[in-house]
């Protein structure tokens, strides 16, 4: 497996990103109804995230392996998604390093409380759990985290 190349998300990444997103969320939280969630994501990614956020793609072996969505105006990580077939290959770390190159200060984000793998990943990076809160879009119980400046 070759290391991930991090680059700007391209239009050609849109369709493969839906599969990566679906596989990642289904693996992270098996109780989610992906058939119900996917149509909303297919609307949200091109309509909301792509025009207004920094979206980075991780490519391995000429295939999309993951992506990150970052709101630089708020120093907010919206999404970090890695194909479960590529977990533990350094892709999440590479995407986070690319985000850190954009924002040297603190970066905040939410993680679903049910997503134990993501929680462990972020805590290994030195992210700090701040408080519980519900996702404003889904109501899912989540943890608010910060990735302090200087970490990464």
Sequence positions of predicted segments:
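Short, flexible active-site-adjacent loop segments at beta-strand->alpha-helix junctions, enriched
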Residues: 24, 74, 86, 113-115, ...
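Acetyl-CoA-dependent GNAT
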Residues: 8-85, 96-98
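Conserved N-terminal entry element of GNAT/NAT acetyltransferase domains
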Residues: 1-12, 143, 148-152
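Conserved acetyl-CoA-binding loop-helix of GNAT-fold acetyltransferases
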Residues: 82, 88-101, 120-124
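Conserved GNAT acetyl-CoA-binding A-motif
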Residues: 102-114
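Conserved active-site alpha-helix within GNAT-family acetyltransferase domains
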Residues: 93-94, 114-143
């Amino acid at each position: 497996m070759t290391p991930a190349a991090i680059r700007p998300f391209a239009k050609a990444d849109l369709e493969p990103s839906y599969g990566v997103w679906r596989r990642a969320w289904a693996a992270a939280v098996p109780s989610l109804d992906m058939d119900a969630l996917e149509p909303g994501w297919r609307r949200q990614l091109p309509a909301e995230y792509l025009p207004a956020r920094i979206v980075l793609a991780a490519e391995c072996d000429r295939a999309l392996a993951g992506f990150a969505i970052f709101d630089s105006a708020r120093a907010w990580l919206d999404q970090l998604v890695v194909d479960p077939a590529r977990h533990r290959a350094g892709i999440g770390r590479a995407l986070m390093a690319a985000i850190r190159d954009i924002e040297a200060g603190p970066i905040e984000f939410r993680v679903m409380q049910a997503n134990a793998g993501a929680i462990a990943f972020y805590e290994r990076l030195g992210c700090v759990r701040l408080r519980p809160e519900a996702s404003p879009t889904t109501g899912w119980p989540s943890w608010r985290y910060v990735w302090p400046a200087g970490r990464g």
